[in-house]
Amino acid sequence: MLKINYFNDTDVNMNSWKKFANKILKIAYNYFNFNYDIELSITFVDDLKAQQINQQYRNHSYIADVTSFPVEMTENEIKAIGFRELGDMFINLSEAKRKAIKYNHDLNSEMGFLFVHGFLHLLGYDHENLDDEKIMFDLQDQILKLNNLVYIIKFNEEDYLESN
């Protein structure tokens, strides 16, 4: 079972995005065939909070669209509490809207990408080098396709960081 705890630190009603995340992440959860329950939190944040989190914990000054903080657990810890706590994901709808316009994506694809991308980071996947990037982005594409979403990355992260 997948349990998602939601928090909303914005002035926007996020109920439709919660339903969307539930659908997408349930498919992602089933894709991995976990033999234990998973719990994670998603907090919707505004630009200011997204930038503060990114500055404080990542030492980057740009406004992030998604930031993830995984929790590492041993098999014994998972068995002891009966589920695996994945960690916390912070999603910035305002930045997602800007990126959807900038890269000509529809907002559902952009948000679907952010939910899956953040989920994979919580599972320990990363894109710090080309080999890891290929693994993570291939998984991301497969899960998005299972959700009937297509997301084409039209920039590389270094270019994005330099422009912000």
UniProtKB/Swiss-Prot annotation:
Its cofactor is Zn(2+). Zn(2+) binds at H117, H121, H127. GO terms for biological process: rRNA processing. The keyword Isomerase does not apply. Its main location: cytoplasm. The keyword Transmembrane does not apply. It is found in: Cytoplasm. Keywords: Cytoplasm, Endonuclease, Hydrolase, Metal-binding, Nuclease, Ribosome biogenesis, rRNA processing, Zinc. GO terms for cellular component: cytoplasm. Binds 1 zinc ion. Its EC number is 3.1.-.-. GO terms for molecular function: metalloendopeptidase activity; RNA endonuclease activity; zinc ion binding. InterPro entries: MetalPrtase_cat_dom_sf_prd, YbeY, YbeY_CS. SUPFAM superfamilies: Metalloproteases ('zincins'), catalytic domain. Single strand-specific metallo-endoribonuclease involved in late-stage 70S ribosome quality control and in maturation of the 3' terminus of the 16S rRNA. Belongs to the endoribonuclease YbeY family. This is Endoribonuclease YbeY. The lineage of its organism: Bacteria, Bacillati, Mycoplasmatota, Mollicutes, Mycoplasmataceae.
